[in-house]
A protein has these predicted regions:
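Well-ordered alpha-helical scaffold segments within catalytic/enzyme domains
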Residues: 25-39, 87-105, 148-162
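Oxyanion-binding "anion nests"
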Residues: 89-135
Length: 188
C-alpha cells in the first residue's frame, strides 16, 4: 500500500490484502534482526507495521480486529477470527519486549495493546475460553486463541503493562485451558 504496510496478493483476483496473522510472521523477525544487526530501523519498521495493522483492522464499535483488509473494499473485511486475533496480540506482546522504555512510539504501541486486551476480555466465555469466531458464542471454544490471549494477558500483568485487575481474566483463561487437557496430556 502507499503507506508502506506489508500486504500480499490475495487469491481469486481480489487484489492486495492485509491479513491479520501476517503481523506475527514478520514482526518477530524484524525485532530480532534489529537486535542482531544493532540497527534500530528494523525495530522501527516492526513498530510502524503494528500500528498500521491496528489502524486498518481494529473495529472501534465491536472492540475486535477484523481478519482481513482488502484493497478493493477499502475497508476491513471478514470475521473476527479468534486465532488471527491471537496472532496479532502475540506479535504486539513480543514487540513490546523489544521496544526500549524511552522509544517515542512505545506508548502508542502500549495503548493499542491495552485497547485490544480490554476488548478481548469482553469476549471471554464463562469457562474462561474464547470462541473461534469471537463475537459468536455459538461457535466452538478454541484452544489456540484462548492460549494466546491468556499468555498475553498474564505477560502484560507480569510486565506491568496491565494492572493486577487483569490477573483474574488471565487465570480464568488458564483454568479454562486446563479443562481441555485429557489424562494423557493431550489437548482435546
Amino acid at each position: 500500500f502507499k503507506d508502506g504496510v506489508l500486504v500480499r496478493k490475495k487469491s481469486g483476483n481480489r487484489g492486495l490484502g492485509l491479513q491479520i496473522d501476517d503481523l506475527y510472521m514478520i514482526t518477530p523477525y524484524w525485532c530480532r534482526k534489529a537486535e542482531l544487526l544493532k540497527d534500530p530501523k528494523w525495530l522501527d519498521r516492526a513498530i510502524e507495521e503494528s500500528l498500521d495493522y491496528f489502524d486498518y483492522l481494529w473495529d472501534r464499535d465491536d472492540k475486535l480486529m477484523h481478519c482481513l483488509w482488502l484493497e478493493e473494499n477499502k475497508a476491513p473485511y471478514g470475521l473476527y477470527w479468534g486465532r488471527g486475533n491471537g496472532w496479532y496480540i502475540m506479535a504486539v506482546t513480543d514487540l513490546l519486549t523489544f521496544i526500549p522504555q524511552d522509544h517515542p512510539k512505545r506508548n502508542e504501541v502500549l495503548e493499542d495493546y491495552r485497547t485490544f486486551i480490554n476488548g478481548i476480555i469482553r469476549r471471554q466465555g464463562k469457562r474462561g475460553l474464547w470462541h473461534q469466531i469471537l463475537d459468536r458464542p455459538d461457535v466452538y471454544p478454541e484452544a489456540s486463541c484462548s492460549g494466546m490471549f491468556t499468555y498475553c494477558i498474564l505477560k502484560g500483568v507480569n510486565e506491568g503493562w496491565l494492572d493486577s485487575s487483569f490477573h483474574e481474566a488471565g487465570t480464568k483463561g488458564w483454568r479454562g485451558l486446563l479443562t481441555l487437557v485429557n489424562d494423557e496430556g493431550e489437548i482435546t
